[in-house]
Amino acid sequence: YLMIESLTVTNFYCFKERTTILFTAKKERNRMLDNNFCGFTTQNKINILKLVFLLGNNGAGKSKILSAFDALQYLIAQIRERKDESLRYRPFAFDEECLNKPSEIEIVYHINDSRYLYSIKWDKYAIYEEILDELRTKTNINLFHRWYDKVSDIVKVDFTDKIQVSDNENYIISSSLLKNNSVFSTIIKTNISHALLNSHLLFFMEGFEIVNLEDVDLNEELPDDKTENSKQLKNVICSFLKSVDTNIMSYEKLKIDVEYPAELLQKLKSL
């Protein structure tokens, strides 16, 4: 059973400072709305929302923070064959200091009865650090720590006793790990079968998916009041909009005839 609890980005696209999206339910829940709109599930004594809305003005960074999921899958699941291959790196562009610092993503997630924190720091040249911790009630247990020393150009990974990686597995991963590959992508490359590490790899490869909706035509897809089916769908959409405090009570689809200025039409003809 896989659930995401939080996602944090630092120096990533438009996010200069550490910014977190929480997927947890607050105490002041509305039970009726919860029942209507999926609500939450309790995992490891934490109430995790099944559905989250991101609201904000154009340019507020909604799509950029969601692109962190895409970045995670790219860094973790894709294999670089050469250590000089560049990585996708999008730091905060309006501060010169940020251009010389790594980006960072942290994700807290649940796999069955366990809760984990994974963090990764990188720039276009290398992955500088990876940490995987198991989060328990009173303490955090480190499972592995990987780091890259830029001065010596050496990559190291330390698997703790808690993760029970054999000496042979440790040797294969350590000797195969390039500065621009993650521990998990190296596991893919070396085809290592380790139950716990493979379960995390499966989470990052299949636990979430970015769906591109840019080609959806709202004029065609948005339901109106013409049929009973579309009325019901419209009521659901309006209920969603109301539940997230948009102050939108209803909407209408109107056909608008566009009139182009004569001067513009004349210029287009002369091109």
Question: What is the predicted function of each stretch?
Answer:
Residues 117-269:
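Electropositive, glycine-dotted interaction segments
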Residues 21, 105-107, 130, 144:
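Well-ordered beta-strand positions enriched in small/hydrophobic/aromatic, beta-favoring residues
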Residues 1, 268-271:
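Short, intrinsically disordered, charge-balanced linker/junction segments flanking boundaries
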Residues 3-71:
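Pre-Walker A-like glycine/lysine-rich segment at the N-terminus of P-loop NTPase domains
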Residues 37-39, 43-53, 57, 66-127:
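Conserved P-loop NTP-binding catalytic core
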Residues 9, 107-111, 134:
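Short acidic, glycine-rich loop/turn motifs
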